[in-house]
């Protein structure tokens, strides 16, 4: 908004200083993807361990796929839902959009007759049903990790994702979906056409199995292992400091 545009430029330098000071006080960094680990290395000059977030695995029985594409998430500018709307409007493909946000009116204005907006009031069960029935899931945004592509894969649904950010670590091209190279409606449209032309017989079971790499059980195990290891490192550091202090006294 206009107030943010007026105030923020003068505060950015102070915020960068605060951010650097805060980062220097961090003992250990955990990144939610290798994409973010690289950014931590670039901006903070620090190494980090990668532990992927978790996703509830959709264990519902598989159903017949229907002839529509799906996108789920908040309707904000950086999600780039506009690319999915434009691509499917251009191709005359049915697209179901689940979510709400400030971009709703803008998206509806550019949408053709094949675009359906379901809003953000659906139950979890209803959303899972759309995940199960969708032909493919469209993910045009660039995100740190991106949980919705994993949710789609847990339903056995392939994902067509922009080939940057966390989606490059969760979507396997040719096995659980495709990447498209440019963050444009034309590039996404070309990816949709390729997906339909190739006619790859995706295995719902294999796609869901891949999503288990991001399960709640895996996350809990890795966090516990990480904390145990770091606690041992910390205790060893205390022991080393204690020995050093004794030697200094002698």
Language model regions located:
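Short alpha-helical donor nucleotide-sugar binding micro-motif in glycosyltransferases
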Residues: 129-134, 223
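Conserved acidic donor-binding segment of nucleotide-sugar-dependent glycosyltransferases
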Residues: 117, 173-174, 178-185, 193-200
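Acidic donor-binding loop of glycosyltransferase active sites
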Residues: 132-144, 157
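A charged, aromatic-enriched C-terminal amphipathic alpha-helix characteristic of glycosyltransferases
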Residues: 183, 201-248
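Donor nucleotide-sugar binding/catalytic pocket of nucleotide-sugar-dependent glycosyltransferases
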Residues: 8-60
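Conserved donor-binding/catalytic core segment of Leloir-type glycosyltransferases
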Residues: 55, 61-98
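Short hydrophobic beta-strand element within catalytic cores of glycosyltransferases
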Residues: 158-162, 171
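Nucleotide-activated donor-binding/catalytic signature segment of Leloir-type glycosyltransferases, i.e.
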Residues: 105-125
């Amino acid at each position: 908004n206009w107030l943010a545009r007026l105030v923020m430029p003068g505060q950015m330098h102070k915020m960068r200083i605060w951010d650097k000071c805060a980062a220097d006080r961090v003992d250990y960094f955990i990144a939610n993807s290798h994409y973010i680990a690289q950014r931590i290395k670039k901006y903070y000059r620090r190494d980090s361990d990668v532990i992927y977030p978790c996703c509830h695995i959709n264990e519902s029985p598989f159903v017949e796929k229907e002839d529509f594409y799906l996108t789920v998430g908040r309707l904000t500018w950086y999600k780039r839902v506009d690319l999915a709307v434009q691509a499917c409007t251009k191709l005359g493909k049915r697209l179901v959009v689940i979510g709400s946000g400030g971009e709703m009116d803008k998206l509806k204005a550019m949408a053709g007759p094949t675009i359906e907006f379901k809003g953000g009031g659906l139950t979890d069960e209803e959303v899972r049903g759309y995940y199960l029935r969708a032909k493919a899931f469209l993910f045009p945004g660039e995100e740190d990790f991106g949980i919705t592509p994993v949710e789609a894969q847990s339903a056995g649904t392939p994902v067509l994702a922009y080939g940057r950010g966390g989606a490059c670590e969760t979507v396997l091209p040719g096995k659980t979906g495709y990447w498209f190279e440019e963050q444009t409606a034309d590039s996404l449209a070309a990816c949709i056409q390729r997906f339909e032309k190739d006619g790859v017989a995706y295995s719902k079971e294999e796609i869901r199995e891949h999503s288990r790499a991001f399960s709640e059980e895996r996350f809990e195990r890795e966090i516990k292992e990480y904390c145990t290891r770091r606690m041992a490192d910390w205790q060893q550091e205390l022991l080393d400091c204690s020995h050093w202090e004794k030697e200094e006294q002698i």
